[in-house]
């Protein structure tokens, strides 16, 4: 008997923690279980061949919002070449409408609904021990029995600490993100999120968590990403883990947490302030700053408190902050979203994620679609097309804003240029709004561009902005360019450095400046030294020193 666990991830760097948990929990049947991971970017024929050559008796596949269509197409063909195999689905994308899924996908024997560890273990036992009566008494499944579809109900939640640690051999996770779960469920009721359905919040034993994190620390894993929905919802749990990783820091490993910033306490902030730059990074969901929207989505957030805490963390200078907004929420029209964007942008996060509402199966938001006039895509990821407050024209405009934010803000490559531009626009949202429109008007939106071409397009756009000094813009761009790297070829818009060649050479020789460092003379006479051997651990920007006095003294002597 061979049972194949299949995961189809969005990217190669991702790994599927869920299927590894299933495999580990069903270790009694380890000799019969094989795990295979693929990506949705692979050719289906290649995956189909690989699965076929395993000659499985049972195929269990995890289904998510990013892979469902891919999985259904793949399994529909696999059943033709593996007619004797049983196919099972599991995961959030099939748990909430299991009967409908089985009616529409006749190749599947059944669906594991909800938490899968105990269910999969029993299911594996059913096949290995060849006991046909097991399915009738097994909770956590919906299955096909002849012409009938039988739903046995959801299983009671399990003890999270009973799941074995899956990371025994890190070689199979090389160059991939390590995911870790220290809690399951969520105490909040955000209407767009499936985590809000699972109110039974539970935690992995803290001492067990420490031992497992030490394994990552000892092995100098580059990054560990916690999948906990609100990591800091229980103060003692979060504080113990943050304190532990701070005290056992190896100087390499980064830990990623999704948190609610307004829940942070002084003790936690004090601990964060002492951390190595880059030890942790925080993802903070703001979603909207419109009070009516926050109330409608059943979200709990004190934005003024959140703002103060984000500012405070920013002042530490050691923690990457990633803030999220969602377009398409109830009561959020275009102008309201502009306001939310400006509010969050002012907090200066390292990343500002502009996402769009996805109407998930089983969520309260799906139940409210008619009342809110929400229209969304038929196929996953079920993304919003329009609402009572936001028409499709404005959704399209926000899509271009999202793209511009990703290219110009989140890349971190235009930071000083963007800050300089703020005073020439009514608000920061207008920068990205107008730049996005410019891209579309010029036909630049559907073309891939080099980093340097992005600078040139920005310059072209700014030529029609009143009162702006193009010379100063160009200097800001040159500054941003050299912050990241010592350019092999200077852009055409950069200031000519030939008049200063001898003075810069003398300065470099006198001060024994490293060969890979760069010295730049700007239009206002400022001379800056970019040291690439000394980089900011958060931004990776070169350390910059003002050497104007040293170079100009040399100029004056000459």
Give, region by region, the residue ranges found by the protein language model:
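A short, flexible N-terminal coil/short beta segment enriched in small residues
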Residues: 1-20
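Glycine-rich beta-alpha loop elements in corrinoid/cobalamin-binding modules
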Residues: 2, 18, 25-156
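Radical SAM enzyme core and accessory elements
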Residues: 2-6, 44, 51, 57, ...
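Proline-aspartate-enriched helix->loop->beta-strand connector
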Residues: 55-59, 221, 349-350
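Radical SAM [4Fe-4S] cluster-binding motif and immediate context
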Residues: 161-315, 319
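A structural motif corresponding to the C-terminal lobe/cap of the Radical SAM core domain
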Residues: 235, 247-250, 256-263, 267-431
